[in-house]
Amino acid sequence: MAPTIQTQAQREDGHRPNSHRTLPERSGVVCRVKYCNSLPDIPFDPKFITYPFDQNRFVQYKATSLEKQHKHDLLTEPDLGVTIDLINPDTYRIDPNVLLDPADEKLLEEEIQAPTSSKRSQQHAKVVPWMRKTEYISTEFNRYGISNEKPEVKIGVSVKQQFTEEEIYKDRDSQITAIEKTFEDAQKSISQHYSKPRVTPVEVMPVFPDFKMWINPCAQVIFDSDPAPKDTSGAAALEMMSQAMIRGMMDEEGNQFVAYFLPVEETLKKRKRDQEEEMDYAPDDVYDYKIAREYNWNVKNKASKGYEENYFFIFREGDGVYYNELETRVRLSKRRAKAGVQSGTNALLVVKHRDMNEKELEAQEARKAQLENHEPEEEEEEEMEAEEKEAGGSDEEQEKGSSSEKEGSEDEHSGSESDREEGDRDEASDKSGSGEDESSEDEARAARDKEEIFGSDADSEDDADSDDEDRGQAHRGSDNDSDSGSDGGGQRSRSQSRSRSRSASPFPSGSEHSAQEDGSEAAASDSSEADSDSD
């Protein structure tokens, strides 16, 4: 039933007889009015503020065609309440020494919530779902706790929750399953759009990396305005911009900028001829470009902070779709001309093509290897090393086990005493032979090491003589023991330095090698004798 409001006059009329009742006032509306309440006037003018909430939060309202077609009169002042003085510029100059009104200072203060660390406030901050929330409890709760259930506070919470609910693959197994799932999803046939059910695919093409063009690094150049020349438009401007080049330059004051070069008419003819003859360039021709604009630049690449990966797609008919990487992003903004100074830059860029050198070809091969060759990650390398160690440890354990089994079998299944003695003799002879071979190999290695460290005999003797002469001049008043000790130490240090410089060169023959080994042993024995004398 529709609500009604009874006034004092209506109450008085209710006690009068029906004959004395007055007729209700006639409404200005043709149709019957269901609600007789008159709406109050709007207390303030429209502010043109964007309504941040859902319009259907309280009621789902749908405007009629009459309301949509009606144009409301908006009566405002011609200057919108802002008086602008175009004559005196000092009108809007702010005096920094003026003190603000206390009311304005409060508006400029930052709202800092006081820390609620008291026990009573923590108790009031608890939400008890089974308790009925009366007005007294709600006001008490809002006094101490911070309520986040208001829709005004929840703006943007759904967007934040979408980011937090995304699956983050932290462990290795989840990453592997996610990668395998992509291959499985790629095999499924596409029947409809992922977000638009009524949209169906017309053609399905596979997507692959562009192995053909990946060797060439690509960059995305973004202009702040159309770089086409003003006197040309349409297809001619597009053809000219497709042949354009950018180069870094420096002016007379040492300021760097980017120059935008466009081809001259003769260059356009040469490029058109090359395209018709299906060749990249003519080896002997020279292509001229004239400067058109000057720009300031901002470059971002993989080494820059906040870099985001960017890719572009190439559609090849009958083959598929290929994607390539945009390593660099260059933003160009027009360079401001100095006041009263006209840009006198009239540069001409002369281009002549050549074949790629070895360094450039190596760089292309390195980029191609990024796609073809799989470099193992650190985790894979660590796992491989651990597996190798485990395999090596198992081999050692097997060898130890086999040796112990052999010993046990020999003890258990021993024959006669003569057979045992003969076997022992054979084993001793084999061990002695192998020991001699090992000792000879060890001696040869030791000789090589000594030669590398101490050098040959002749060099060590010359070094010793020179060291003796030098020390004799420097330490004439010292004792014999100190002289002998310094002689041995100096001989060792000089022979070590000389051998380091010599060890890099290979030996020409085996005879010289053996002679130098004998000399190194002699040098080592001399140094050891000198050490014993000093001791």
Curated annotation (Swiss-Prot):
Covalent crosslink: Glycyl lysine isopeptide (Lys-Gly) (interchain with G-Cter in SUMO2): 133, 154
UniProt keyword annotation of Transcription regulation present: yes
Keywords: Coiled coil, Isopeptide bond, Nucleus, Phosphoprotein, Transcription, Transcription regulation, Ubl conjugation, Wnt signaling pathway
Domain of life: Eukaryota
GO biological process, one term: mRNA 3'-end processing
Phosphoprotein in keyword set: yes
Residues that bear Phosphoserine: 117, 456
Comp. bias regions, Low complexity: 502-511
GO cellular component, one term: cytoplasm
Span list, region Disordered: 1-23, 361-535
Positions with biased composition (Acidic residues): 375-398, 458-470
Coiled coil: 352-400
InterPro entries to which the protein is assigned, alphabetical: RNA_pol_II-assoc_Paf1
Residue ranges, compositional bias (Basic and acidic residues): 361-374, 399-434, 442-453
Localization: Nucleus
Molecular function via GO: chromatin binding; RNA polymerase II complex binding
Primary role: Component of the PAF1 complex (PAF1C) which has multiple functions during transcription by RNA polymerase II and is implicated in regulation of development and maintenance of embryonic stem cell pluripotency. PAF1C associates with RNA polymerase II through interaction with POLR2A CTD non-phosphorylated and 'Ser-2'- and 'Ser-5'-phosphorylated forms and is involved in transcriptional elongation, acting both independently and synergistically with TCEA1 and in cooperation with the DSIF complex and HTATSF1. PAF1C is required for transcription of Hox and Wnt target genes.
Protein family (similarity comment): Belongs to the PAF1 family.
Subunit organization: Component of the PAF1 complex, which consists of CDC73, PAF1, LEO1, CTR9, RTF1 and SKIC8. The PAF1 complex interacts with PHF5A. Interacts with POLR2A, TCEA1, SKIC3, KMT2A/MLL1, SUPT5H, RNF20 and RNF40. Interacts with UBE2E1.
The protein, known as: RNA polymerase II-associated factor 1 homolog
Species this chain originates from: Mus musculus
Gene from which this protein is expressed: Paf1
